[in-house]
Amino acid sequence: MPELPEVEVVRRGLQDYIVGKTITAVRVHHPRAVRRHVAGPTDLTNRLLGTRINGIDRRGKYLWFLLDTDIALVVHLGMSGQMLLGTVPRVDHVRISALFDDGTVLNFTDQRTLGGWLLADLMTVDGSVLPVPVAHLARDPFDPRFDVEAVVKVLRCKHSELKRQLLDQQTVSGIGNIYADEALWRAEVHGARIAATLTRRQLAAVLDAAADVMRDSLAKGGTSFDSLYVNVNGESGYFDRSLDAYGREGEGCRRCGAVMHREKFMNRSSFYCPRCQPRPRR
């Protein structure tokens, strides 16, 4: 699933190409892509026609178009969603198409059809204007108002595994499995450690590492293991070549040389160094 850096790459691409343009046509090719818009495909297309894109915003893994009608078009990429400008490699994966007044075509493709679009009202939460479906999400590490100390305070009260808390989008948004493993490796903390047992300094180090690794990923266009994540021009990111933990089972730790381990975690996998990140004793 695209995580914060990948969604931010898409947001920046859309910001450059479609802000200031007006939607002149919309076609929903697959109703499942608008299943979260409870009023249905016809309502969504009718309300989008003639609207101007005033901006593109994001929180965590969600992005949204700010429209001139004081509502937002919320986009969730799911596991395989892509926002592509121009031609697409697989027309059978196109779920929604939008045409703009200058002839630009935006296609939402989604092989697994787990993502989608919906229109939503805006509300103000803690000084930020957010679409209602996004309002429950915590600030992410790229947010100018992200407060490390405030998140540390929350984590110090959590009697569950730290990695589980990093993936909880109501604690801190935008971090997924890949960047959680990378942050924990950089901070030399095992994800199975109980959050409340860690010091403030250790927790802050993990959060700082998460922000740093995601900035590094953003600079390289994000992480692409397959064709499911690409930018708006269909190009893959290349941060996967720089991963220190995720996917490196059996390889040497880049810090100490120990063999990297993998273990099951919440129907996923966690990757870590057994020497740098010793597993807590039960």
Swiss-Prot record:
Residues annotated for DNA binding in this entry: H93, R112, K158
EC number(s) recorded for this UniProt protein: 3.2.2.23, 4.2.99.18
Cofactor: Zn(2+)
Zinc finger (FPG-type): 244-278
Alphabetic keyword roster: DNA damage, DNA repair, DNA-binding, Glycosidase, Hydrolase, Lyase, Metal-binding, Multifunctional enzyme, Zinc, Zinc-finger
GO biological process: base-excision repair
GO molecular function: 8-oxo-7,8-dihydroguanine DNA N-glycosylase activity; class I DNA-(apurinic or apyrimidinic site) endonuclease activity; damaged DNA binding; zinc ion binding
Lyase recorded as keyword: yes
Catalytic activity: Hydrolysis of DNA containing ring-opened 7-methylguanine residues, releasing 2,6-diamino-4-hydroxy-5-(N-methyl)formamidopyrimidine; 2'-deoxyribonucleotide-(2'-deoxyribose 5'-phosphate)-2'-deoxyribonucleotide-DNA = a 3'-end 2'-deoxyribonucleotide-(2,3-dehydro-2,3-deoxyribose 5'-phosphate)-DNA + a 5'-end 5'-phospho-2'-deoxyribonucleoside-DNA + H(+)
Residues of the active site: P2, E3, K61, R268
Record keyword Lyase present: yes
CDD domains linked: EcFpg-like_N
Cofactor details (free text): Binds 1 zinc ion per subunit.
UniProt subunit comment: Monomer.
Family listed: Belongs to the FPG family.
Chain's role: Involved in base excision repair of DNA damaged by oxidation or by mutagenic agents. Acts as a DNA glycosylase that recognizes and removes damaged bases. Has a preference for oxidized purines, such as 7,8-dihydro-8-oxoguanine (8-oxoG). Has AP (apurinic/apyrimidinic) lyase activity and introduces nicks in the DNA strand. Cleaves the DNA backbone by beta-delta elimination to generate a single-strand break at the site of the removed base with both 3'- and 5'-phosphates.
The name this protein goes by in its record: Formamidopyrimidine-DNA glycosylase
